[in-house]
């Protein structure tokens, strides 16, 4: 990313929650509905302050819980409003029913998940279990590595969600504790330039309420009978098409952002020191910084390590990831969550599923760490690199490795 401040930009030192709030303000949303929950709570406070101070001309709706949060915003979206919310953990679980309904209604809502681990045992600290638990519902999911990426991606999310080839809700996920409360340099773009980037808001969603154009929204639809046996299938197929269309749109929107603002974020995946790499580790979210340091140290020792960061997790960037990993001889995938039915991490599952279409079979190993706020340090990633290097050179059984088990 560029370290040169653009003439109309402002420089802040802020945490990820404040960065997300600034992005929502710059996107000129019409309605915000939120319910506070750790580690998202300060994001709600920033938004309330921006609205109270007149910085953001949006209506904020105070509700009794997360189920009502998304229910309220669904109605606002149907009326053509640009909307926003944020949640995590048990709050995300409480809103699951309307969360499930939102992509089915093809509503371009943007929501931040300030990721944390889930119950039980009790934990309010960082992890990816909450966001990973809803990965198959139909929302676009993008994971941020830095505070700056939180701000930039949240603004871009509106242009992605509202694109007529997509029309799906977008989750912008940043790590609880590490990004939510960790302060860093953040460049705040000019409001006029953001307005030009997003363009005129098109309130004519395909489901916008209009008394002159009546339609049935979310009617009872069966696969056998009802308004037509094929209706449900065609609707689901349309959702999948919108999701796959978003891969191209996400790439185009990130390229447009880079041209306008001079900050170039990887849209789908980021390849780091993959030239000539013998083996690679795959990361997601804020852990990537420490992982890059470990890769640099390995390269300095003469080890041909590389790294691929997944930015867009849903839809999963199969072609991009397979291409990036095509020449390596082993892969280590690091998750901050667990797929209990497979005794591995969800990102590992998706990575090996994608690699099934690769020209050659590449052995892979699952590493799980950073649960419940546990730190993933350079030393942890040096272990990941060592085990992946061993797999590349000696083969063997690719067991699941629990990184923080003896910390």
Please describe what each predicted stretch is.
Residues 125-169, 173-176, 200, 360-374:
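Conserved thiamine diphosphate
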Residues 1-133, 138-139, 155, 175, ...:
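Thiamine diphosphate
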Residues 48-53, 250-252, 256, 293-307, ...:
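Short helix-loop-beta junction
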Residues 13-20, 255-279, 292:
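Glycine-/acidic-rich phosphate or pyrophosphate-binding loops and their flanking alpha/beta elements
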Residues 335-407:
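Peripheral docking tails and interdomain loops at the edges
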Residues 43-46, 72-74, 95-99, 120-126, ...:
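Short acidic, glycine/serine/threonine-rich loops at helix termini
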Residues 170-270:
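Conformationally flexible catalytic loops at phosphate/diphosphate-handling active centers
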Residues 269-303, 316-323:
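Redox- and metal-dependent alpha/beta enzyme cores, enriched for Fe-S-associated oxidoreductases
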């Amino acid at each position: 990313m560029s370290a040169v401040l653009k003439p109309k930009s402002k420089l802040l030192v802020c945490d990820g929650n404040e960065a997300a709030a600034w992005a929502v303000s710059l996107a000129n949303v019409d309605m915000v509905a939120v319910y506070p929950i750790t580690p998202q709570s300060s994001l709600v406070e920033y938004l309330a302050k921006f609205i109270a101070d007149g910085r953001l001309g949006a209506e904020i709706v105070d509700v009794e819980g997360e189920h009502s949060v998304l229910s309220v915003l669904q109605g606002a979206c149907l009326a053509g409003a640009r909307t926003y919310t944020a949640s995590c953990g048990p709050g995300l679980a409480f809103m699951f029913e309307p969360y499930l309904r939102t992509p089915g209604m093809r509503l371009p809502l943007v929501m931040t998940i300030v990721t944390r681990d889930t119950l039980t045992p009790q934990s309010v600290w960082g992890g990816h279990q909450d966001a990973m638990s809803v990965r198959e519902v139909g929302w676009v999911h993008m994971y941020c590595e830095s505070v700056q990426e939180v701000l930039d991606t949240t603004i871009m999310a509106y242009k992605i969600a509202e694109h007529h080839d997509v029309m799906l809700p977008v989750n912008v996920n940043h790590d609880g504790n590490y990004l939510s409360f960790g302060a860093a340099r953040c460049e705040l773009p000019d409001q006029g330039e953001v307005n030009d980037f997003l363009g005129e808001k098109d309130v004519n969603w395909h489901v916008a309420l209009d008394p002159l154009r009546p339609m049935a929204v979310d009617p009872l639809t069966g696969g056998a009978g009802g308004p037509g046996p094929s209706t449900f299938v065609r609707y689901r197929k349309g959702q999948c098409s919108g999701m796959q269309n978003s891969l191209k749109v996400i790439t185009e929107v990130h390229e447009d952002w880079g041209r306008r603002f001079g900050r170039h974020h990887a849209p789908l995946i980021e390849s780091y020191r993959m030239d000539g790499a013998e083996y690679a580790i795959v990361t997601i979210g804020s852990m990537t910084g420490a992982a890059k340091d470990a890769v640099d140290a390995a390269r300095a020792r003469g080890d041909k390590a590389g790294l691929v960061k997944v930015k867009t997790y849903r839809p999963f960037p199969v072609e991009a990831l397979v291409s990036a990993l095509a020449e390596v001889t082993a892969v280590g995938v690091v998750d901050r969550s667990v797929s209990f039915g497979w005794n591995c991490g969800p990102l590992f599952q998706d990575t090996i599923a994608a690699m099934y279409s690769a020209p050659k079979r590449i052995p892979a190993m699952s590493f799980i760490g950073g649960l419940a706020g546990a730190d993933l340090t350079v030393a942890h990633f040096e272990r990941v690199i060592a085990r992946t290097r061993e797999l590349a050179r000696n083969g063997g059984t690719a067991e699941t490795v629990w990184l923080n088990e003896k910390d």
